[in-house]
């Protein structure tokens, strides 16, 4: 099953440059049964490998902007470290709340894909210096969920740079690649990567991303990106629902156990009273 998941996700990444973490994390949690931190770490390495394959198609065509890429990385890398640390700290409690937060973050990042580009190029040129600061929360979000570099990075570049769409996509893919490589190292250090599942994803993902890159110029990218963002949004909502359901079940179980313990403690004084009465009779 993981082979098929890897192929489908990689095909979408090759065609549009987005969807890696937004699809992989919900799939690994809902289908693979992985905990949140392991799903994010595994998705990070998988997304990094996919972008490593897709990046040359844009680098060799010089469809990226070095200056804007540098600004994005200056802000995003510190945020990436913070987001990773926060995820690991929350995951130590093994709480369904982590899954709920992941679902909310993934849903929000997918919803951003539906925003339109501002038409004021003068605004974009004058305010591009803010890219580093605006990229910081993208790094935090990516470190926590492995997603967002694609959708959020693209939206940021569309509105704070005057680049043409082809350069936006190329710059964003390289941005996501660097974040994925650094994020993979962070998560690997914390031991939050499932190697067997990762290899299965890669076996299906490598041919998928190659096929997607080969057909990228023949497919209407805009419509496909909207479709992928919509599916990712629904997957994020499903993750929230699954986390809420698990949280309710765990609370109900805890309440039942508490009630059982209270019942046992309630009967203990009666046993002590019987012992005192027996002693008096003797």
Residues covered by each model-derived region:
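Juxtamembrane transmembrane-helix boundary motif
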Residues: 1-9, 30-31, 36, 56-145, ...
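Membrane-helix interface "capping/anchor" motifs
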Residues: 13-21, 160-170, 220-222
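Interfacial segments of multi-pass membrane proteins
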Residues: 24-38, 152-167
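Transmembrane helix-bundle signature of multi-pass membrane transporters/permeases
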Residues: 40-48, 77, 169-177, 206, ...
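Transmembrane alpha-helices of multi-pass small-molecule transport proteins
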Residues: 42-57, 107
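Transmembrane helix-bundle signature of multi-pass secondary active exporters and lipid flippases
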Residues: 179-182
């Amino acid at each position: 099953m993981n082979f098929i998941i890897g192929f489908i996700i990689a095909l979408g990444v090759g065609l549009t440059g987005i969807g890696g973490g937004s699809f992989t994390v919900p799939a690994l949690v809902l289908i693979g049964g992985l905990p949140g931190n392991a799903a994010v770490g595994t998705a990070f390495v998988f997304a990094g490998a996919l972008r490593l394959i897709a990046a040359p198609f844009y680098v060799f065509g010089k469809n990226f902007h070095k200056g804007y890429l540098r600004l994005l990385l200056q802000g995003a890398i510190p945020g990436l470290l913070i987001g990773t640390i926060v995820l690991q700290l929350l995951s130590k409690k093994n709480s369904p709340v982590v899954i709920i937060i992941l679902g909310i973050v993934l849903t929000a990042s997918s919803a951003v894909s539906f925003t339109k580009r501002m038409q004021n190029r003068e605004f974009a040129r004058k305010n591009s210096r803010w890219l580093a600061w605006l990229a910081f929360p993208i790094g935090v979000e990516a470190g926590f969920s492995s997603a967002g570099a694609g959708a959020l990075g693209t939206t940021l570049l569309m509105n704070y740079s005057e680049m043409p769409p082809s350069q936006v996509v190329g710059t964003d893919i390289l941005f996501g690649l660097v974040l994925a490589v650094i994020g993979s190292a962070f998560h690997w250090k914390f031991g939050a990567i499932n190697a067997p599942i990762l290899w299965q994803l890669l076996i299906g993902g490598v041919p998928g991303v190659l096929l997607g890159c080969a057909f990228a110029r023949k497919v209407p990218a805009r419509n496909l990106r909207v479709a992928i963002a919509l599916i990712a949004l629904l997957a994020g909502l499903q993750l929230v629902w699954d986390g809420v359901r698990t949280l309710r079940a765990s609370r109900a179980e805890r309440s039942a156990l508490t009630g059982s313990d209270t019942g046992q403690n309630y009967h203990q004084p009666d046993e002590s009273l019987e012992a005192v009465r027996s002693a008096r009779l003797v």
